Design a protein with these regions (language model features):
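Conserved N-terminal catalytic core of the sugar/cofactor nucleotidyltransferase
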Residues: 2-5, 13, 31-108, 119, ...
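Short beta->alpha linker loops
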Residues: 29, 55, 80, 210, ...
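Catalytic-core segments of class I nucleotidyltransferases/pyrophosphorylases
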Residues: 46, 105, 112, 118-125, ...
Length: 234
C-alpha cells in the first residue's frame, strides 16, 4: 500500500514561522515535522510515499529529495495553488493507486500522533470507501466530527448505542472511488465526500486513544516539541 502525506497547506495559523519555511519543515525535537511521519511510515512498511506541496514546496523537495536518505521512495505532486484536501488527493491519484482500484493511506502533515501505522487496514471490504482513525476531542474541537457505531463511522445516531463524538485524526485509508467526479487540478474539500459516504454506510473507523495533536499553531508546536523531547529523554 502506498501512502500520501498532505503538505500543501499555507500554514497561515503558524505565521510568522511559516513566512519563509513551509510548515512540514518546522522542527519537532530538532527534526522536521514531516520526517517524523516518514520514519514512522517506513517502520510500518510504507516505503512508497507521495507528498503534495504548494507553499514553498521547492524547499520540501530540496530537503527530502527522492527519500533515499530516509530509506523510502518519495514522489511529489506539486500544486500551483492549494487544491484543498480532496483536490490534492485527486491530482495525485495516478501515483497513489496506479490501477485505480487499490486503496491508499493518507496522513495530514500537520499532526503528531503515536498511532501505529502498521495497524491500518491494507484493504477496504466492499462497500467501504474509507477507514478513518478517530481520536478524543481536543480543546479546540470539543464537539468532535463523527461517532463510531459497531465499527462504522456515523454522523448521528441513538446516543445509547454510539460512542461519544470523536475527532477525525487526519489519518485514513481511502479508496480511489471516493474521488470519482473530482477532476485533476480541481479544488475540492474532503469532508463533503466523507459525509456522503458515511450517509451510505461506506466508512469504517477506529478509536485511537493515544497521543495526538493538531500542530496548527506555534503554541501547539512548542507543546509537541516539549513532549517529544521528554519522551526521548532530551
Amino acid at each position: 500500500m502506498r501512502a500520501m502525506i498532505l503538505a500543501a497547506g499555507l500554514g497561515t495559523r503558524m505565521r510568522p514561522l511559516t513566512l519563509d519555511t513551509p510548515k512540514p519543515l518546522l522542527k519537532i525535537a530538532d527534526q522536521p515535522m514531516i520526517e517524523h511521519h516518514i520514519l514512522r511510515l517506513k517502520a510500518a512498511g510504507f516505503t512508497h510515499l507521495v507528498i503534495n506541496h504548494a507553499w514553498l514546496g521547492e524547499q520540501i523537495e530540496a530537503h527530502l529529495g527522492d527519500g533515499q536518505r530516509l530509506g523510502v521512495e518519495i514522489v511529489y505532486s506539486a500544486e500551483q495553488e492549494p487544491l484543498e484536501t480532496a483536490g490534492g488527493i485527486a491530482k495525485a491519484l495516478p501515483m497513489l493507486s496506479p490501477d485505480g482500484q487499490t486503496p491508499f493511506a493518507v496522513i495530514n502533515g500537520d499532526i503528531y500522533c503515536d498511532y501505529p501505522f502498521a495497524q491500518l487496514p491494507l484493504t477496504l471490504e466492499a462497500p467501504k470507501m474509507a477507514h478513518l482513525v478517530l481520536v478524543d476531542n481536543p480543546a479546540h474541537n470539543p464537539a468532535g466530527d463523527f461517532a463510531l457505531q459497531a465499527g462504522s463511522v456515523v454522523d448521528d445516531s441513538d446516543e445509547s448505542e454510539v460512542i461519544s463524538a470523536l475527532t477525525f485524526s487526519g489519518i485514513s485509508v481511502l479508496s480511489p472511488a471516493l474521488f470519482d467526479g473530482i477532476h485533476s487540478g480541481e479544488k475540492a474539500a474532503l469532508a463533503p465526500l466523507l459525509r456522503a459516504a458515511i450517509s451510505e454506510g461506506k466508512v469504517s473507523g477506529e478509536h485511537h486513544s493515544g497521543y495526538w495533536v493538531d500542530v496548527g499553531t506555534p503554541e501547539r508546536l512548542t507543546e509537541v516539541d516539549q513532549f517529544v523531547r521528554e519522551q526521548n529523554g532530551v
